[in-house]
Amino acid sequence: MKSLQPRLLAAGLALSLLAACAAPVKPTPPPPPVALKPAPKIGLVLGGGAARGFAHIGAIKTLEAQGIVPDMIVGTSAGAVVGALYAAGNGGFELHKLALQMEEGQVSDWSLPDRGVIRGEALQNFINRAIGQRPLEKLSRLFAAVATDLQSGEAMVFRSGNTGMAVRASSSVPGVFQPVKINGREYVDGGLVSPVPVKAARDMGADFVIAVDISDQPRYGNTKSTIDVLLQTFAIMGQSIVRYELRDADVVIRPQISGLKATDFQDRHMAVIEGEKAVAAALPEIKAKLAKLREGR
């Protein structure tokens, strides 16, 4: 009997050890996930300026070359034209090619004077064909076109619906283009109330706004045509509005295109080059401010 005791003791110890080994081990909780800081949303704002709008294409080309791609685009008038084509998925080089191939007659449908000498349907159709008939909300990037409500005088930011019609409304210079009726309201050029629509971009969620200002300064000299008179009036009216709007932009790009008339489609290549040069000069500022914003988030 005594000889069994050591054996029983050994067996008990073995069972105890086995039980201890079989006991579940409480897992160590994983470390809390690291909260990733959201990247700042970049808004590209393209101002109005008729034929000077070709400079926007150069600006886009240089930004793309540096990997600076906007999350949203907002445009007025000529800026709405370029912005819609860009938001549809065309890159800077595609836009440049399209600009060089475009004929003025493709976007101008002259008519007998009836609240405007250009109907605007040609521009509307040109845009819709170029973007595959997609509505605003179906474009590749978030986009808005800014127009002026002719009855209330307030800015209207189009973010859904017929893209070509919204661009046409945004570009309808009073006295040149006929007003555009959308949902029972009439709209004219957005440059009357928002030539460089920075506020619209902020309202859409932009954390960092790059604004391209192609507005013209009033010209000293003869205004040779009715259109020249109207555009001179726009330039005079828009100066104070532009200064006010640009205060809320992070970076302002001003291509040196003062020698290019708003009605001159012949110097489009020069306008593109000046847009490229203006952004290239502003790149250190853009990169420094973006880096600072990212560090602080």
Which role fits each region the language model picked out?
Residues G75, G79:
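Gly/Ala-rich beta-loop-alpha elbow adjacent to hydrolase catalytic centers
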